[in-house]
Amino acid sequence: MKKISIKQLYREPEKFINKDIVVAGWIRTERTSKNFGFIELNDGSFFKNLQIIIDTNLDNFDKVSKLPISSSIVVEGKLVATPSAKQPFEVQASKVTVEGTSLQDYPLQKKRHSFEFLRSIAHLRPRSNTFSAVFRIRSLAAYAVHKFFQEKNFVYVHTPIITASDCEGAGEMFRVTTLDLNNIPKNDEGKIDFSQDFFDKDAKLTVSGQLSAESYALAFGNVYTFGPTFRAENSNTARHASEFWMIEPEMAFADLTDYMDVAEEMVKYIINYVLENAPEEMNFFNSFIDKDLFKRLDNVVNSEFKRITYTEAVDLLQKSGEKFQYPVEWGIDLQTEHERYITEKIFGKPVFVTDYPKDIKAFYMRLNEDNKTVAAADLLVPGVGEIIGGSQREERLDVLEERMKEFDLNEKDYWWYLELRKYGSAKHSGFGLGFERILMYMTGISNIRDVIPFPRTPGSAEF
């Protein structure tokens, strides 16, 4: 017989009631007496467990009844409805095959464990209730991202992980090298001679797929990239990781308004998809992680996002009478406290802030007519602050070259990016959404380390 997932049983029980089935998974709990016992089985496909009834009719009852938590078994038996019990059905086992016995010192016993402890056993934490739910949500949300863009006929582009370009111009990148670190070659100036390295130049791990995606947007129209990015920032905060995933669409013949329209629609789509397809997990998060979760998500999906300029935002903050840790004046980069005040206290819903000062934004953002601001827009949401950053890209070659000089960037490193402005340049826009940021927002999980399977942070690269 073909193995059935526990999720299938819960989603379509009428197909399987009073039929012989095969299920396989890991023991969550076991209660046995002399002649019979109850096993709570979980196979990772669903939030809820499946109750297995075992009795002395099993040839190996003595062995099965003494199995430790997390032992893996394959169960054959009949699925029987149990309308008067707390679970809707159970399996009356006719055969139990023990695949792997767990040791008694299995670290995930029934008691509650702190998230900090569970991070130390990242290889086992997906077996816990919370993290099995988190990573099923991560899978569903990733599927929703692809589904959204594919339905809109965006082309999925795989941008390179190894690059010679710094998209942000910040220089906080991980270096990729095969040079002998005990005998590093030097050039005549006494600097590292990267011409002897694997790529004949200084290569890094990407901080963004945006620049590469732009080249494909100017061929396919609408594209998106969704993959890992890396930042060598020494930030030990709950919101930062050294390796994370980014959703980055780029759209040709699109301005700032077009970007904001797509971003708003995408955020609502992902949240709705997860709410509809993982109600058990989301109920768990709303009950045990963040009791205001449903209220917050409902506010996002049912509100029209507000749009204000950076100048208007600064004016509102200055007139609020609120005493902020970081004083507000035109030209500063808005801090999380400012962003949250705008979206929570002033508007009570998501807010796009547009047209930031050019000095605090990246070189590739389109310079506005005032020569002081750029056509950028960040999406701020209640409870978090900024989750999306994007802009209309600078399509004018002369302006882009001038901006690169202001940022002291070497044009030779970006020759191909500049060439895009020579051969049929067009207005285009795009944005970046940190995938983990929206996962944190949808689950109420407050630390980015708890929505990434194996988090990479300063001083930590275990597993």
Curated annotation (Swiss-Prot):
Protein keywords:
Aminoacyl-tRNA synthetase, ATP-binding, Cytoplasm, Ligase, Nucleotide-binding, Protein biosynthesis
Subcellular localization, as worded in the UniProt entry: Cytoplasm
A GO cellular component term found in this entry reads: cytoplasm
A Pfam family (short name) is: tRNA_anti-codon
Q: Which family does it belong to?
A: Belongs to the class-II aminoacyl-tRNA synthetase family.
Gene symbol of the encoding locus? asnS
State the protein's name: Asparagine--tRNA ligase
The reply to whether Protein biosynthesis figures as a keyword in the UniProt entry is yes
Enzyme nomenclature, EC number: 6.1.1.22
**What is the protein's quaternary organization?**
Homodimer.
| Record's catalysed reaction(s) | tRNA(Asn) + L-asparagine + ATP = L-asparaginyl-tRNA(Asn) + AMP + diphosphate + H(+)
> Origin, by domain of life?
Bacteria
GO MF terms held by the record: asparagine-tRNA ligase activity; ATP binding; catalytic activity, acting on a protein; nucleic acid binding; transferase activity
